[in-house]
Regions:
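Polar, low-complexity export/assembly segments characteristic of proteins
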Residues: 2-186
Length: 186
C-alpha cells in the first residue's frame, strides 16, 4: 500500500478498515458485530489486525509519504486493535483469551511511545487517538512505533496471527463437533 499512499491521493479511514476486513467487510460495523458469534469475530478480527500491522509496516515513513494516509491507516488500525481485544477477551477459548491478554499487555508496554503520537492506552488495553496530535507527529516518530522494524507492530502481527489460528481451530471444532463431549452410551 505504500505505493498508493505516496501518490498524493488521500484514502479514508473506512477505506483502510474495508481493506483490513477484506474477507468480510461488514465485520467492522457495529450492527454486524452484534449479530455475529464471538468465535467468528475473534477470527475475523485476528485476520484484520494481522493485515493492519503488515500495512503499517509497508509504509515508507519519510517526508514524501502522504501523512493523512498514514494517519487514517493508524486510526483504522486502532479500531481493528480495539475490536480484536474485545472479541478475543470475550472468547470462550482460553488460547484466544491468552493472545488478547498479550495484546493488552503490549499496548501498555508501548503506552509512552504511543502517547508521544497522541494515542492514549486505556486501562482495558484499548486505544484512543487524538487525530490532530497524531497528524502533527513526525513521520520518523510514527515509523519508530509502527514501521517495518518496530517491535510494537511485529508483536501485534505475531499475536494476531496466533489468535486468528486459534480462533480458526475453535470455529472448525464448533462446525464439525470435534472436541465436543461424546456420549459413548448406546
Amino acid at each position: 500500500m505504500s505505493t498508493v499512499a505516496s501518490t498524493g491521493m488521500s484514502l479514508s479511514q473506512n477505506y483502510y478498515l474495508r481493506s483490513y476486513y477484506q474477507n468480510n467487510q461488514k465485520m467492522f460495523k457495529a450492527s454486524t458485530r452484534k449479530e455475529t458469534s464471538n468465535s467468528r469475530l475473534s477470527y475475523e478480527d485476528g485476520l484484520a489486525l494481522r493485515r493492519a500491522a503488515r500495512n503499517l509496516q509497508s509504509f515508507e515513513y519519510s517526508k514524501n509519504d502522504n501523512g493523512e494516509n498514514i494517519c487514517n491507516s493508524i486510526l483504522a488500525f486502532i479500531d481493528t486493535y480495539n475490536n480484536t481485544l474485545k472479541s478475543g477477551g470475550a472468547s470462550s477459548s482460553s488460547d484466544v483469551n491468552r493472545y488478547a491478554r498479550h495484546l493488552k499487555q503490549l499496548s501498555h508496554k508501548y503506552s509512552d511511545d504511543l502517547s508521544s503520537l497522541g494515542i492514549t492506552v486505556n486501562t482495558d488495553g484499548t486505544m484512543t487517538a487524538n487525530k490532530n496530535l497524531l497528524g502533527k507527529s513526525s513521520a520518523s516518530d510514527v515509523g519508530k512505533v509502527f514501521g517495518k522494524e518496530a517491535d510494537f507492530t511485529k508483536k501485534t502481527e505475531q499475536y494476531a496471527r496466533k489468535m486468528e489460528s486459534k480462533s480458526s481451530d475453535s470455529l472448525y471444532a464448533a462446525l464439525t463437533g470435534s472436541g465436543s463431549n461424546i456420549d459413548f452410551q448406546a
